[in-house]
């Protein structure tokens, strides 16, 4: 793909946009209209003589010149509706519509909008009568000293007065003397806010907000923020005054609310949204919204963008920004300083020659032109703001020093510029500040907020003997008040194990707390103890309030269910101990029983006693390391529908079914005296837990045909090909607890258990157990599990699960967004698919395709080709990982590397690629452009086996796509992608199922009709 892009505008911002767009390998030419001397002839960049005010003529120009994308720099064309007009004419245009651009073009609209959507801003009133405005200024109960022209005034329509009289004079100048023309027909009078002013910008596709690093502009002409207001005399980025946490707050409470609000009001906002923000003592407040890049903010933000700007803009227009989030250069600062003409912002001289460009560029600086023109082959001044000099270095001080060198090199008569750009950041950075606990990664305020949120949850678990009041050093429990006379105490501690990993992958944290409580209170119930109180331990690297609150809310609800108090706990934030998003849990329960009620009563247990099994809710919290391994090898993801017969839920939800708590239902039965022992079936399964409550001389014989085995166990056994012993030693197999009772009382106890709403069965009996004999024998287990997962028809077992011949293990190689990867992921989730994706490899880090894979629970690897001397070494590294994952088939989905001969030969007949044309026509990387230039009416896409010659492998499937009149590379590409998403999965299914094979003679063989 080799696109042509048109940038609208003539300033330093537009030169910067053109410079950044020209860096894209997908862009072959950037035209700028009307442009300046810097964009006249600079590599891919040149100026275009086309009227930008006549939108019809502009649209025709774009069609004639095959422009793929129009990028609008200044605000005036946006307010004039250029985006809507070009879009209606079939030209892709980056920026908000005129309706959405009212956020900038009408300050009155913007203020009303912010009030409607609770976006923090200064107090204000709008006026069309100057007398009313002045009356408000003198009577307002806040300092009403900021006067703004409501319309567009080239960034200069704001006057910050020092007194009420000065504010009233500003009103007169704007409304009566028309200092800003029609823009001042309505004025907005605002509260004067105090604090640091910063610029926070974002890309948005109308849903997703991708924030940029915060910047700070310098509006006043002279050092020390003296002199008149200008369009901006310099900027730096990132602004250290805006911490990461504060930027998140600004994103959520300002930028995202604005985007969501525009969507709700029927004017979806797409493009750049710029919020000018004051950092007040009451938090960030919006001063103004702009609907485009600021100038000079653009000149310091875009040099820090690592991503392809063209790609980001196209993804934004496609509504796919979430899959192509921009990546920024970290641990670097950018500074830009504006050089202006003498007399600016008033009258100034034009036509003054500028020298020193080679010297500035030799310093490694970027010089962006603004008010410049070419005259007799020389660069001369033609505007108030003439040049911006941008330096990027590892820190702000170094960037400032480099920018000053460029200013010294560039010369024109009467040049003025500020020498103190960044002075506020310098002062902020040099301010003596001792380290805080938060600097080390521990946020005490967040911890306090968590305690405040969970206090009512814990309070609700109070019970006789304990009134919960979090915040003390320890908790107290009054055994006497709880009704105990001669008690023994029992305690137990446990965790949830790697079930946590699944909860974190599924982003489902509300049920894991019940697992923690259940594991502890069920253990002490085995001693006959009533659970009295519970304490939790939650540890993480970075406290996420919503996640932690969800976990602890689950713990509190489980404590209420168990009848114990959530007496306290510990939330430990330990930076660098855990990866982002991960946490660990541990619990501690204390219970009590009267001395004569202690279990197990070993002396009472005799041969012939009955074993009653109480149903589990599912897997409970054991065996999850094996479960995760089985899922990894299976054709399902955690987000896939659960196997047949397991309910209308995802596999992740099925596996996260919380552990059953037995204390409330079984404690009265245990206290009746009829129960001799209670075994909690936890780690070690049936084989290792029941013997823990039996005398050494006894064991048990169990019959699995007597109880209901949940279908999840059948799926695990079949998918993992697990042996009967492995099942019995790892899982509870449907029995969460076992009671030992006298044979003659079994029927009564079983009746009582069922009356307490527990599902239960007599599942076996106590038997004598000679030394060295198995203490638990389970008959009919594998038969019951397999029958349970199958349907019997005509005397044969038919699987009720999508168990089929072994599925092909697929690896997908990517370099970018991975839209075809998503199609492959979606198709292989189908239970009928003959393949499943086990690995995604990218030769580039931080690309959207990796995020797609991780969201689907697919392992990923990044193998950077730049770290290898040649293609063969890189391919060997890839091959090693493919072998590690036992890959059968390789799919190339936007993988931008030519593979070496040895690698291709090894994977001959097992490696698929998709090409965006009907091969053998239009080979190579710019197929769509070739199609359009050839004037054909049909194109399409082709899935083929990979051969050593590029795009020359045997064809598996093709799909035709019409070429329509007026198509651009972008529109044609989108239409072809739809076809790609259809036939790539279909071709993979053909190869994985064996329907299509590559013969030894290099020809396609169809094993069966499709």
From Swiss-Prot:
GO terms for biological process: 'de novo' AMP biosynthetic process; 'de novo' IMP biosynthetic process; 'de novo' XMP biosynthetic process; brainstem development; cerebellum development; cerebral cortex development; GMP biosynthetic process; purine nucleobase biosynthetic process. Pathway: Purine metabolism; IMP biosynthesis via de novo pathway; 5-amino-1-(5-phospho-D-ribosyl)imidazole from N(2)-formyl-N(1)-(5-phospho-D-ribosyl)glycinamide: step 2/2; Purine metabolism; IMP biosynthesis via de novo pathway; N(1)-(5-phospho-D-ribosyl)glycinamide from 5-phospho-alpha-D-ribose 1-diphosphate: step 2/2; Purine metabolism; IMP biosynthesis via de novo pathway; N(2)-formyl-N(1)-(5-phospho-D-ribosyl)glycinamide from N(1)-(5-phospho-D-ribosyl)glycinamide (10-formyl THF route): step 1/1. The modification Phosphothreonine is found at residue 682. The active site is at 915 (proton donor). Signal peptide: none annotated. Residues 111-318 form the ATP-grasp domain. Disulfide bonds: none annotated. The modification N-acetylalanine is found at residue 2. Its cofactor is Mg(2+); Mn(2+). InterPro entries: ATP-grasp, ATP_grasp_subdomain_1, Formyl_transf_N, Formyl_transf_N_sf, GART, GART_AS, PreATP-grasp_dom_sf, PRibGlycinamid_synth_ATP-grasp. Residues 434-809 are annotated as: AIRS domain. N(1)-(5-phospho-beta-D-ribosyl)glycinamide binds at residues 818-820, 977-980. GO terms for cellular component: cytosol. It catalyses: 5-phospho-beta-D-ribosylamine + glycine + ATP = N(1)-(5-phospho-beta-D-ribosyl)glycinamide + ADP + phosphate + H(+); 2-formamido-N(1)-(5-O-phospho-beta-D-ribosyl)acetamidine + ATP = 5-amino-1-(5-phospho-beta-D-ribosyl)imidazole + ADP + phosphate + H(+); N(1)-(5-phospho-beta-D-ribosyl)glycinamide + (6R)-10-formyltetrahydrofolate = N(2)-formyl-N(1)-(5-phospho-beta-D-ribosyl)glycinamide + (6S)-5,6,7,8-tetrahydrofolate + H(+). In the N-terminal section; belongs to the GARS family. HAMAP family: AIRS (MF_00741), GARS (MF_00138), PurN (MF_01930). Homodimer. Trifunctional enzyme that catalyzes three distinct reactions as part of the 'de novo' inosine monophosphate biosynthetic pathway. This is Trifunctional purine biosynthetic protein adenosine-3. The gene is Gart.
